[in-house]
Amino acid sequence: MGIGIPDVHEAWTWYRKNLNMDVPVFEEAATAALMLPYTGGKPHDRHAILAMNMQGGGGFEIWQYTSRTPVAASFEPKLGDLGINICKIKSPNIKAAFADFDKTYLLSKDIETTPNGLKHFFVKDPYGNIFQIIESDEWFTDRGDTTGGVYGAILGVSDIEKSLAFYTTVLGYDEVIWQGEGQFSDLNSLKSGKSNFKRAILTHSKARKGGFSPLLGKTQIELVQNLDEKGQNIYEGRYWGDLGFIHLCFDVIGMKSLQEECEAAGHPFTVDSANSFDMGEAAGHFSYIEDPDGTLIEFVETHKIPILKKIGWYLDLTKRDALKPLPRWMLKSMGLNRKKD
């Protein structure tokens, strides 16, 4: 999950303390030269940190403009506005997570239950970003933390049927766990959460493949269409990288064939690093597409990753079977880079 932030180091401190996102994969200050369609046609400088929670789940790309002041939305986004509304964070113990969470940031008064029976609650970080802490029983390792990594996202859409077609085919979220329409009590703590919604919760029926699949695990995409209030585009009049959830990122294998599939589906790459980008400590090939409402989806095919930076141990992923998971001991070794406060 990409998160536009006013102060990258201050934000990472908060995410370490509250969400245990404490293992850095890379940290780099550089110029974002390829995102011109979304940065006003000009390259801009930025500082980014990719941080993971080694219990399992996806990571945060914590992203700060340094050549301009990042801009907040001119309105307070409501549930169903177009774009990434909420980041899902999985938890091995939802009761303990709720009890332990700093009450300053809780939105939910109590633990709620999703329509498909999962316990969850909502929190808001100091920058206005909302996270759904949701129970999961799939884990890479047990560190004793009450939260894990990214489990997916809740996306506001204008036409749920059109978005379902996109996410079930182009992104492979082919299993509809639950779909319905109405008012949902588990959303009441959110702005406009008492509205009528069309709502669908998706996952993928096939086990994930690739080097990092044991760590990243299964994910969910939840689509919400507000039937009472028209959704506004959360990034209207702003740049990618401005404050908020800037993109949803997927680890992929075979960028060229993926490009062909996306073009055939009517969602061509809008940004393509063409061959390889170098983030200093990590390298790979990245591209972007837009969902039917213009929400940005990033694909990254990783070529190089740091395993243990202290001794200069980096793994070249281009020299191994891309579909085969990395050994668990090797993935766990990344945890030795953990930053402790």
Report each predicted region and the residues it spans.
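Core segments of cupin and vicinal oxygen chelate
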Residues: 4-57, 113, 156-218, 280, ...
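C-terminal functional regions that serve as terminal interaction/effector modules
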Residues: 8, 203, 208-209, 215-226, ...
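Short glycine-/small-residue motifs
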Residues: 59, 132-133, 296-299
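Short, structured interface segments
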Residues: 61-65, 117-143
